[in-house]
Amino acid sequence: MDHEAAQLEKQHVHNVYESTAPYFSDLQSKAWPRVRQFLQEQKPGSLIADIGCGTGKYLKVNSQVHTVGCDYCGPLVEIARNRGCEAMVCDNLNLPFRDEGFDAIISIGVIHHFSTKQRRIRAIKEMARVLVPGGQLMIYVWAMEQKNRHFEKQDVLVPWNRALCSQLFSESSQSGRKRQCGYPERGHPYHPPCSECSCSVCFKEQCGSKRSHSVGYEPAMARTCFANISKEGEEEYGFYSTLGKSFRSWFFSRSLDESTLRKQIERVRPLKNTEVWASSTVTVQPSRHSSLDFDHQEPFSTKGQSLDEEVFVESSSGKHLEWLRAPGTLKHLNGDHQGEMRRNGGGNFLDSTNTGVNCVDAGNIEDDNPSASKILRRISAVDSTDFNPDDTMSVEDPQTDVLDSTAFMRYYHVFREGELCSLLKENVSELRILSSGNDHGNWCIIAEKKRGCD
């Protein structure tokens, strides 16, 4: 069992971060406030370890302490070193440090990547081993309980969100200025802004939908293409603006739950007849329901489905909003450009807001292309999920050949309320919990190593 767990983590954690590490080299993200506060409260001269330091975001928060970082991912450690941080490659299950060597330890977003309970316990015990008696340990893990999202299972696969990475890079490089669209140059992961449209971060390259699938099947991501939809008067523009807000929330980190989607539907309904809208340039919409298969040849039936499950409802004419499937939607999201993309349409589908969704054009969809004529009618909101930025599906639910086998899918074990505290109380007796709580979709605990423990 341990071997299988290690293989899963290698494929869906280590390999993914190693492959995507280059995209973080120029990314300067801010330290989370509570983690920053914890580090700044440590006594001057303290020796602190950041286990799973990544690019070293927290290694220079407090200049009065000495912070050492370590991470399993070599490329991320190299980025941290290039930034002047002290970091090394190591395994959380076998830390290369002597017993009771650190005054404080932080573990931010690491424990949820271990795929079994025993491996999670071992990782925490290792950190407790190298912590001095009276020293404090801070742990952050993803929470299953979310305000606007839900998970049906705790073990999920999540696609790497390149859109988020692009947005954060844009924010860090253009702080204080209005962010505008950029167009990529071949072979470069980051791109300068342009002024042709008002979308926050819009790259003319293909990007993956935020969707995940069963561990027992090959991982993949459906590629999403956005087409510019022309404006036809203020009424139509209002429709697109409202609809665009739904899409931005739906595609990016803030997934809409069912009740929120119903509110969006009510706002959109009086603005535009869906029959006219469907005759305009059509965009690709990825499925949010585990039963949808992009390879079906016929439109999906909506018989027996209540309107509560629909993102888009029937108009007075009884016709559903229809979506065309763009060719090549199941390609690999690896940063490579698959041919020359060209702009299409007059208006901007996404108006200016802080979204960070990578936008690409569907200009190469031709009317006589058989694969482009496949229609997907129903978009379910039932499986709306929440995390940092991605939609997920249970690793136990098998998928058909909807997804590409080479996409970057990360494994996460999302923690139920109280699960992390119970894990420590029942299995790591040398630690006592000082505080616990929820911080932006993460469970956070601060524990102290008991004095007199071996």
From Swiss-Prot:
GO CC annotations, alphabetized: cytoplasm; nucleus
EC number: 2.1.1.-
Residue positions, PTM Phosphoserine: S214
Pfam hit, one: Methyltransf_11
Signal sequence segment: none
Record-level GO BP terms: tRNA methylation; tRNA modification; tRNA wobble uridine modification
Keyword S-adenosyl-L-methionine included in the entry's annotation: yes
This protein's UniProt keywords: Methyltransferase, Phosphoprotein, S-adenosyl-L-methionine, Transferase, tRNA processing
CDD domains: AdoMet_MTases
Tissues in which the UniProt entry reports expression: Down-regulated in breast, bladder, colorectal, cervix and testicular carcinomas.
Family, as annotated: Belongs to the methyltransferase superfamily.
Record-linked PANTHER family: ALKYLATED DNA REPAIR PROTEIN ALKB HOMOLOG 8, TRNA METHYLTRANSFERASE 9B-RELATED
Protein's job: May modify wobble uridines in specific arginine and glutamic acid tRNAs. Acts as a tumor suppressor by promoting the expression of LIN9.
Name recorded for this polypeptide: Probable tRNA methyltransferase 9B
Organism this protein belongs to: Homo sapiens
